[in-house]
């Protein structure tokens, strides 16, 4: 699972950075942490992997249940990030059909399509690579170490600057 977490953190970073860069018309390195990874995408991927046995046989389930699961994760991640880091990484309050600016109908639909692609095509592709060998595991553990270090650095930055972290 660590391998998949690392891969999908990186792919999520690429996806989000490309999306934001297209909107801004210049390269933007997305994410709360420094480095080429966004843990929310890794967590989302792990959630979908846990649901995979129940969803992969149906495009409809992959689409709707995956989208609902990812939207719920996005909501609670937004709450956690705001409380832990005193920052808001996204704000959908100007979108129609949104809830507390944390989730919106537009991004729910995006999550539905991404969940469908992930469950039906992306994750089966990575499973077929049979990447569970020692060297890849070592690389992923090192990568996970970078993610943890970036997270710890972020917490220490807030602590040094006198911000309350819960």
Predicted feature locations:
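Aromatic-rich, lipid-facing transmembrane alpha helices and their immediate juxtamembrane interface loops
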Residues: 1-166
């Amino acid at each position: 699972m660590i391998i998949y977490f690392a891969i999908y953190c990186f792919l999520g970073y690429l996806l989000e950075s490309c999306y934001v860069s297209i909107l801004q018309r210049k390269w933007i390195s997305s994410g709360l942490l420094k480095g080429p990874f966004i843990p929310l995408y890794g967590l989302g991927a792990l959630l979908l992997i846990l649901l995979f046995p129940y969803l992969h046989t149906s495009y409809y389930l992959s689409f709707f249940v995956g989208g609902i699961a990812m939207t719920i994760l996005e909501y609670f991640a937004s709450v956690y990030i705001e409380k832990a880091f005193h920052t808001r990484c996204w704000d959908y309050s100007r979108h129609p059909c949104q809830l507390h600016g944390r989730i919106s109908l537009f991004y729910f639909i995006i999550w539905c399509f991404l969940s469908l692609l992930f469950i039906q095509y992306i994750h089966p592709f990575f499973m077929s690579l049979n990447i569970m060998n020692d060297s890849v595991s070592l690389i992923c553990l090192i990568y996970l170490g970078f993610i943890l270090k970036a997270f710890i650095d972020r917490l220490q930055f807030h602590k040094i600057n006198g911000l309350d972290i819960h």
